[in-house]
């Protein structure tokens, strides 16, 4: 009885449909539905729409939410590319393949999985009062293709991943009916690419179902939809275009009025009534004045309006709609973008459709507002939706928050399809992006559009050129590019802006500095250049995060990585690995983002990404986790110091100096706001480790908006520094929260003399080494370049890129290192517990030692953090008791001559040798010398194999991308 009352309940409400709302009657279809799985795809031939389906589910929702589907197994055919097959074949991973407890390393794991056809069925009642109305079936987001029957009559088919599925039921008689919906989430009809974030199991999951609003709607039979508003901030006019479906003579009057919101300033724009509107190409065109001082929408002032439209027909029917819009202009201006005439710089992140609790994107505005406000708190003003388009709630939230969006067609036409070769996906992209314009085109946050991500196809350039021309001629409210691509993809010359990977990365094969920029990459083009997928620096998994997976997807990958770490005797090191690798990750993002900010005429960047990516082998590239929560090693306040609308920048040739040098730094101010900062006082100060200011100064400067401004030079003679120490340089604008800082290290050219005659320093494990140890002596064994066990493990100063599974163990393999800075061994070497710039020359491309034969409890002094897929026990420096003696073994770049250009390396050697001469040199672990010999003579027992010949595009020859 209760369900019947629900079905009969009719409410007068405001329906938000894309960018507009209309007064109407609705009947909610949420609730219990009959259900059946059609594994053999026989439902149409057997006329299931004429039968009552026996199972049941609750909608809105997915099959997974309703516990429907097949148990995940080794035979599960994921909608995803997997290039690392080691999990399926490696004997050491056999226990993770147990049918009772499968732990996939490649992606988050659902309990059930299903790709194919499923049927949904519900009894409905159409009121008699609706008979003279247009009746619409509205399904906000379906996954993927739907076919609808009312009783035994086929109504139609829809296939959209970006927009509501709507069906006209106006010819259906009043009374009781059975609605049957067939949903197919396979890629058989239209293959957008199995790794597209709109469908892939790497991200949201390839779900089957309907989410969001589900309802029957009754509106006037003359109802006019797809009303689009085109603001012109120069003329202060909004052009309203209303496509006609009925003859003009039937329209009696159109009334318009606008009211502002989301702004401290309130405006009510006067009513305008039109009785004879202009008609151009079967479209009513109305010019509506916004008054003398309309409020403009931007990241700084996201003022919005509701345009109330009332259409009256001669037969007495009327239509009322309230359309949200903003007065804004987002354009290309030379090599940069402009917002309302002001130069802007896009500081963006990808949003990859990772929602572990539900397995699909949120349909409520509040959750999207939470996510976008987090993005903004980290200094970002832009979001790219990788190969998918979010629901309307995301656009509404971005309107409120002030974020520039780049949704994309729902395709990564690669890895199972191609673009421009005549496949169904070619027309589908045009259809889908037109649907995006219809439902979301009025949102001011919708500023940019691309077909999707990194396509394959011999004719992709021709196709994307046509795509750009089509859209730039059709709708000038936003700007267009063909595709978001890396460097190996062919150039589309007619792009209004470029998204390429040339303006990203750190050149840390050479000494780190902060003078260089990406000018060479961006100056190759006359249009704005956005760095494609900047970052991708990994941190170690946060196993505390496992408890947050309380929904439909479980972090079995994290559980597997945790077990592997524990098997290696390092389970108690997980938190240290997370924090140390996280600090290195932030250091990389800081330096790469600052390099982007100091590039003149740069268009911006798109990080990959602010939060973690759940799939493709588990890409822990975010400073936030998959839930957009902090991991503990950086927060928004810290991150936004170097990523914001205004950022102090410091140019210098190095971060490591000797006390015979002078520190020279150039201060400039990145400032992309709407106003200049006149008579700014820019302070700088240099502090020692105790926080004492050793040098400071102030610059007085006008900071101009929309560019970088040179502020002044800092010079500091370092001769007064007699001992190795870390200094901090701070630069900020007085009276504001805009400040930034950098660490530099100063090492003495002349070190205090210590008598090292009691230490046998050697680069070979020779006979004398054993003699010294057996007689109770001390040995420093420098095995740099001589390591065999671990030679296959590549260490650089930079951490793992994306992850080693997706890229088939492409180097580097480590995530920085962890040490105890309070250990006496480092008493004379300034360091924290993690990698920092003073370690670059010491650690970069140095060998690691694989301690696979050492006791599980053995802990080195300098411990590289291995890729979490293997968690091998590694060392760069370790100490031990051997025989009657004691030894330190190092594989780092440590020079012995006093004239070396590696002052940090000399200082580290000094600190270690001084430690060896002290009473504190008392290693906890005793080992046999054979273990050390094994490091130099025996290869690792375990060598990784991917058991696969396939590879991602980045590992393929360029010629294969255009096939």
Give residue ranges: language-model regions:
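Flexible loop/turn segments at secondary-structure boundaries
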Residues: 144-146, 186-190, 206, 353-354, ...
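Extracellular/periplasmic catalytic domains that process cell-envelope and extracellular macromolecules
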Residues: 27-28, 130, 173, 338-339, ...
């Amino acid at each position: 009885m209760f369900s019947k009352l629900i079905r009969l309940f009719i409410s007068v409400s405001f329906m938000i449909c894309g960018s507009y709302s209309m007064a109407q009657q609705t009947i909610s279809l949420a609730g219990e539905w009959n259900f059946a799985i059609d594994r053999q795809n026989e439902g149409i031939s057997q006329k299931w729409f004429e039968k009552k389906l026996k199972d049941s589910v609750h909608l809105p929702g997915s099959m997974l939410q309703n516990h429907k589907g097949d148990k995940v197994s080794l035979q599960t055919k994921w909608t995803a590319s997997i290039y690392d097959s080691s999990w399926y074949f490696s004997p050491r991973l056999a226990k993770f393949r147990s049918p009772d407890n499968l732990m996939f390393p490649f992606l988050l794991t659902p309990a059930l999985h299903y790709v194919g056809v499923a049927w949904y069925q519900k009894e409905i009642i159409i009121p008699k009062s609706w008979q003279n109305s247009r009746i619409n079936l509205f399904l906000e987001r379906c996954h993927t293709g739907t076919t609808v029957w009312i009783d035994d009559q086929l109504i139609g088919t829809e296939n959209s991943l970006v927009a509501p599925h709507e069906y006209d039921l106006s010819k259906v008689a009043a009374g009781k009916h059975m609605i049957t919906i067939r949903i197919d989430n396979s890629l058989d009809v239209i293959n957008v690419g199995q790794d597209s974030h709109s469908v892939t199991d790497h991200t949201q999951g390839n779900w089957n179902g309907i989410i969001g609003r589900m309802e029957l709607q009754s509106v006037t039979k003359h109802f006019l939809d797809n009303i689009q508003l085109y603001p012109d901030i120069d003329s202060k006019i909004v052009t309203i275009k209303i496509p006609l479906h009925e003859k003009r003579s039937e329209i009696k009057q159109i009334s318009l009025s606008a009211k502002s919101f989301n702004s401290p300033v309130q405006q009510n724009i006067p009513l305008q009534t039109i009785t004879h509107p202009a008609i151009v190409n079967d479209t009513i065109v109305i010019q509506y004045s916004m008054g003398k001082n309309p409020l403009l929408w931007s990241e700084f002032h996201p003022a919005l309006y509701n345009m109330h439209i009332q259409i009256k027909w001669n037969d007495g029917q009327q239509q009322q709609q309230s359309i949200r819009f903003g007065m804004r202009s987002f354009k290309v201006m030379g090599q940069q973008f402009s917002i309302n005439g002001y130069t802007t710089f896009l500081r963006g992140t990808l949003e990859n459709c990772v929602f572990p609790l539900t397995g699909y994107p949120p349909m409520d505005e509040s959750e999207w507002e939470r996510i976008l406000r987090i993005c903004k708190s980290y200094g970002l003003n832009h979001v790219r939706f990788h190969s998918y388009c979010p629901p309307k709630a995301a656009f509404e939230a971005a309107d409120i928050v002030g974020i520039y969006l780049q949704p994309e067609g729902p395709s990564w036409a690669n890895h199972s399809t191609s673009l421009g070769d005549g496949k169904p996906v070619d027309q589908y992209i045009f259809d889908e992006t037109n649907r995006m314009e219809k439902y979301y085109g009025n949102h001011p946050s919708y500023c940019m559009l691309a077909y999707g991500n990194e396509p394959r196809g011999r004719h992709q350039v021709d196709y994307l050129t046509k795509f750009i021309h089509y859209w730039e001629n059709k709708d000038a409210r936003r700007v267009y590019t063909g595709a978001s691509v890396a460097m190996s993809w062919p150039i589309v010359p007619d792009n209004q802006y470029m998204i390429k990977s040339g303006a990203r990365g750190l050149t840390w094969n050479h000494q780190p500095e902060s003078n260089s920029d990406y000018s060479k990459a961006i100056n190759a083009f006359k249009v704005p250049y956005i760095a494609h997928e900047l970052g991708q620096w990994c941190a170690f998994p946060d196993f505390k995060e496992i408890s947050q997976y309380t929904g439909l997807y479980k972090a079995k990958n994290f559980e597997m990585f945790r077990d592997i770490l524990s098997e290696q005797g390092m389970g108690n090191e997980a938190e240290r690995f997370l924090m140390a690798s996280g600090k290195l990750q932030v250091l990389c993002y800081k330096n790469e983002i600052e390099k982007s900010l100091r590039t003149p005429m740069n268009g911006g960047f798109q990080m990959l990404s602010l939060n973690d990516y759940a799939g493709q082998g588990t890409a822990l590239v975010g400073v936030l986790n998959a839930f957009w929560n902090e991991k503990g090693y950086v927060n928004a306040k810290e991150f936004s110091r170097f990523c914001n609308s205004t950022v102090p920048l410091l140019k210098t040739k190095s971060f490591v100096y000797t006390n015979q040098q002078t520190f020279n730094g150039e201060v400039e101010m990145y400032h992309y706001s709407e106003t200049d900062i006149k008579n700014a006082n820019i302070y700088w100060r240099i502090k020692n480790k105790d926080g004492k200011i050793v040098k400071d100064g102030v610059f007085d400067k006008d900071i101009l908006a929309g560019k970088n401004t040179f502020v002044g030079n800092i010079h500091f003679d370092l001769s007064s520094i007699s001992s190795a120490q870390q200094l901090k340089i701070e630069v900020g604008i007085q009276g504001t929260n805009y400040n930034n800082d950098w660490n530099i290290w100063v090492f003495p050219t002349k070190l205090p003399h210590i008598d090292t005659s009691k230490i046998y320093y050697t680069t070979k494990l020779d006979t004398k080494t054993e003699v010294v140890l057996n007689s109770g002596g001390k040995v420093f064994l420098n095995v740099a370049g001589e390591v065999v066990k671990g030679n296959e493990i590549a260490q650089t100063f930079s951490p793992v890129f994306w992850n080693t599974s997706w890229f088939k163990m492409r180097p580097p393999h480590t995530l920085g290192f962890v040490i105890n800075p309070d250990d006496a061994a480092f008493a004379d070497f300034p360091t924290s517990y993690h990698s920092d710039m003073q370690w670059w020359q010491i650690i970069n491309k140095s060998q690691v030692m694989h301690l696979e034969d050492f006791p599980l409890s053995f802990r080195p002094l300098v411990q590289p953090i291995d890729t979490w897929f293997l968690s091998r026990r590694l060392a760069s420096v370790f100490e031990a008791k051997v025989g009657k003696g004691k030894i330190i073994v190092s594989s780092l770049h440590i020079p012995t001559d006093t004239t070396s250009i590696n002052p940090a390396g000399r200082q580290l050697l000094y600190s270690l040798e001084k430690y060896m001469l002290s009473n504190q040199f008392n290693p906890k672990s005793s080992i046999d010398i054979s273990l050390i010999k094994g490091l130099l003579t025996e290869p690792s027992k375990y060598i990784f194999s991917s058991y696969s010949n396939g590879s991602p595009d980045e590992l393929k020859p360029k010629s294969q991308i255009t096939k």
